[in-house]
Regions:
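Ribonuclease/tRNase effector modules and their secretory precursors
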Residues: 1-77
């Protein structure tokens, strides 16, 4: 199963929300929705390394755990 086939399972923790908002300089509280839109973007590059997926899109890198679909963190490139 790939990340794109499981976007309905993608979530994060309360700490993850704060970390992602801070790292990506986001104003929205819907960081999961924001990240899912980046993951679904046709120009995004998704790779799996070990236990995580890495999504490169619009100048940021989003890290998602491959087994739990938890967004761990996101950074600007």
């Amino acid at each position: 199963m790939s990340l794109l086939e499981n976007t309905d399972k993608i979530h994060t923790t309360q700490m993850g929300v704060g970390r992602i908002k801070r790292n990506l300089k986001l104003d929205t509280d819907d960081v999961v929705g924001y990240c899912i839109s980046k993951i679904k973007d046709k120009n995004s590059k998704i790779s799996r390394k070990g236990k995580n997926y890495y999504v490169e899109a619009d100048g940021c890198i989003i890290t998602v755990n491959a087994s739990s679909y938890t967004i761990i963190t996101a950074h600007l490139k």
